[in-house]
Amino acid sequence: MAPAFGKCFMFCCAKTSPEKDEMATESYEAAIKGLNDLLSTKADLGNVAAAKIKALTAELKELDSSNSDAIERIKTGFTQFKTEKYLKNSTLFNHLAKTQTPKFLVFACSDSRVCPSHILNFQPGEAFVVRNIANMVPPFDQKRHSGVGAAVEYAVVHLKVENILVIGHSCCGGIKGLMSIEDDAAPTQSDFIENWVKIGASARNKIKEEHKDLSYDDQCNKCEKEAVNVSLGNLLSYPFVRAEVVKNTLAIRGGHYNFVKGTFDLWELDFKTTPAFAFS
């Protein structure tokens, strides 16, 4: 049986010892008390100083409350998972403790509204998942984007997945950012995002050229799917992916989840990426 959450949190997750945590709590409470005492004893404090002290006191209390809420959410979330899933599916989790044999490698956006385990009801052990901004798959390059490359290699070469699914979605902020990049414009102050979404630049260019009369929002909608097609094409630049596709032991598909309408579109890669199915 898994250890109790309280022990797990204290010994596995905490960065400080219990003694230091207690000291930190005492220091925090002492700071609050000191500020309140200062307000009550120093009647001659200027209005500005008094207001700043009150604001600081309120901010400290709010921060403590926020931290407590976050910890409680994590605790109750794990407790519910353990009670409703882990303990009720002992056979599955005993098997997963020894190995994993997922059938899917899934690329999905980091957007909090599009978790593939929820929208496609994947159970533990079913899908090896990679999430990033705008669900991008960069082309094969051993010197760049090695995190994605390592995930693809592990899933295809070692886990022997039979399916790769790249899922785009409605209202994607990454795609909106991509479509907002102007030709020959100076780089933005973004440290990572702009260069990352430019992986889908060919999708942006195609939509801009073929649908120049559409509104920006409509262009973004089309680019959400076209960027998936670019990622599907990029997957074929990985030698180990291409080899399995040629042997017909690996299928590559694109998907698009519209959480506004509650629909999911699915299409297969036949080197043309033509739409095949739609669910509603």
Swiss-Prot record:
Cellular component annotations (GO), alphabetically ordered: chloroplast envelope; cytosol; mitochondrion; plasma membrane
GO BP annotations listed: carbon utilization; negative regulation of stomatal complex development; regulation of stomatal movement; response to carbon dioxide
Modification type Phosphoserine: residues: S117
In-chain residues carrying the UniProt-annotated modification Phosphothreonine: T57
EC annotation from Swiss-Prot or TrEMBL: 4.2.1.1
GO molecular function: carbonate dehydratase activity; zinc ion binding
PANTHER family: BETA CARBONIC ANHYDRASE 4, CARBONIC ANHYDRASE
UniProt protein name: Beta carbonic anhydrase 4
